[in-house]
Amino acid sequence: MQLTPREVEKLMIYTLSDVAFKRKARGLKLNYPEAVSIITVTALEGARDGKSLEDVMKEASKVLTKDDVMEGVADLIPNVQVEAIFTDGSRLVTVHDPIK
């Protein structure tokens, strides 16, 4: 299978988010990469589902709380940016203050 660097990166993000969602379900606090992967995948999947850019940003900013992450992780993530494919094309999604 031939994958582009972007496809490899997306695959890694989705793999990490799968692990992160399972850890979150077990009640474990998430570290930085796990938190970013969950926020990113939430945005990517929202776009894929046909949601608007505004709805995707809102949903991705509500997927995690400070109680879900290790101490200090929320402060390390002022925003998350990902290029997502919407029904009308590709757009940059910026989620500001994603962990509240």
Swiss-Prot record:
One of its GO terms (molecular function) is nickel cation binding. Its main location: cytoplasm. It comes from the Bacteria. It is found in: Cytoplasm. GO terms for biological process: urea catabolic process. It catalyses: urea + 2 H2O + H(+) = hydrogencarbonate + 2 NH4(+). Pathway: Nitrogen metabolism; urea degradation; CO(2) and NH(3) from urea (urease route): step 1/1. Keywords: Cytoplasm, Hydrolase. Its EC number is 3.5.1.5. InterPro entries: Urease_gamma, Urease_gamma/gamma-beta_su, Urease_gamma_sf, Urease_subunit. GO terms for cellular component: cytoplasm. CDD domains: Urease_gamma. The keyword Hydrolase applies. Pfam families: Urease_gamma (PF00547). It is an enzyme of class 3 (hydrolase). Belongs to the urease gamma subunit family. This is Urease subunit gamma. It comes from Yersinia rohdei.
